[in-house]
Amino acid sequence: MLEEKKKQESFEIQRIYIKDVSFEAPNTPNIFHVNWIPTIKLNLNTTTKKIKENIFEVVLMVKVTVKIKEDLVFLCDIDQAGIFFIANINEKRLKHCLYSYCPNILFPYARTCISNLVSCGSFPQMNLAPINFDALYHDHIK
């Protein structure tokens, strides 16, 4: 019975934290008087690092760039990180866990932080849509 428990797949969130965050609005206050027809660019990236046996850091990097014509309205980026305990998972499932499941856990935290920063910058509320990290992962491995 004890041997079965040792072999059982295990996943635990140990910590979720902001590793880095930045908000820049270089064209304020003049940009507040411009007709609000922005273009929004969203970039995502994920990095992983094995800290020690069965302990992994996953960092979801989210960068939002908003422009009106050629003028930068604001740039907001966050490195939302988590430390995860993952044991007894084969290599294929481990990669899926690190590059899909963990970013899915981290994204709502990053989205909330970005929304708060944008609001504090006195810009219209920004609600990023949910991201299908499973689809992104499967596209990446093809």
Curated annotation (Swiss-Prot):
Where, subcellularly, is it found? Cytoplasm
Identify the Pfam families for this entry: SecB
Swiss-Prot/TrEMBL GO biological process terms:
protein folding; protein tetramerization; protein transport
Q: Which GO terms describe its cellular component?
A: cytoplasm
Statement: the UniProt record of this protein carries the keyword Cytoplasm:
yes
Keywords from the UniProt entry: Chaperone, Cytoplasm, Protein transport, Translocation, Transport
Q: Which domain of life is it from?
A: Bacteria
Q: Which GO terms describe its molecular function?
A: unfolded protein binding
Q: Which family does it belong to?
A: Belongs to the SecB family.
Q: Any idea what job this protein has? A: One of the proteins required for the normal export of preproteins out of the cell cytoplasm. It is a molecular chaperone that binds to a subset of precursor proteins, maintaining them in a translocation-competent state. It also specifically binds to its receptor SecA.
Subunit info here reads: Homotetramer, a dimer of dimers. One homotetramer interacts with 1 SecA dimer.
User: This chain belongs to which protein, by name?
Assistant: Protein-export protein SecB
Q: Gene name on record?
A: secB
